[in-house]
């Protein structure tokens, strides 16, 4: 929520009081959304930054590649969220110089994410034969690798 407070200009307390926080996993989040009254239809992507922070810890996610166990767990969580109804995976890829920063003023996790890790995450969509990759920014050559690895469309 602190990252959202900084970038979306919605106060932390407002989010805390105005939204249910009765979930931990993406499937639980989707169940919570289902229970919550809404005025509009909605669909979700699985954001890679929170998954990486959940599995690796914030400092590790911002400072190194995933190890094999972490990569496998993130891929498992992506598959789990897709099975629960997620549209695909999403990431901000604006680089270290992005002005859209994390709550502590440093780049977002996915701005620093290793390209090869991202490609491995995209392969989950190929395995499932469905889903989209949503990327804010990013290098065209990397985005092309993602589409090739996933066999899926990209929203860029």
Task: State each model region's role.
Residues 89-156:
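Active-site core of metal-dependent hydrolases
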């Amino acid at each position: 929520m602190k990252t959202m407070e900084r970038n979306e200009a919605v106060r932390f307390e407002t989010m805390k009081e105005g939204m249910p926080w009765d979930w931990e996993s993406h499937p639980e989040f989707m169940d919570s959304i289902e229970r919550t009254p809404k005025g509009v239809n909605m669909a979700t992507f699985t954001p890679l930054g929170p998954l990486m922070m959940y599995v690796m810890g914030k400092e590790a996610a911002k400072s190194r590649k995933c190890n094999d166990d972490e990569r496998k767990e993130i891929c498992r969580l992506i598959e789990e969220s897709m099975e629960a109804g997620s549209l695909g995976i999403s990431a901000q890829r604006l680089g270290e110089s992005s002005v859209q920063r994390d709550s502590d003023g440093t780049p977002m996790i996915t701005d620093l994410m290793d390209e090869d890790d991202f490609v491995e995450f995209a392969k989950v969509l190929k395995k499932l034969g469905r889903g989209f990759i949503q990327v804010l920014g990013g290098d065209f050559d990397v985005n092309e690798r993602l589409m090739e690895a996933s066999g899926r469309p990209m929203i860029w």
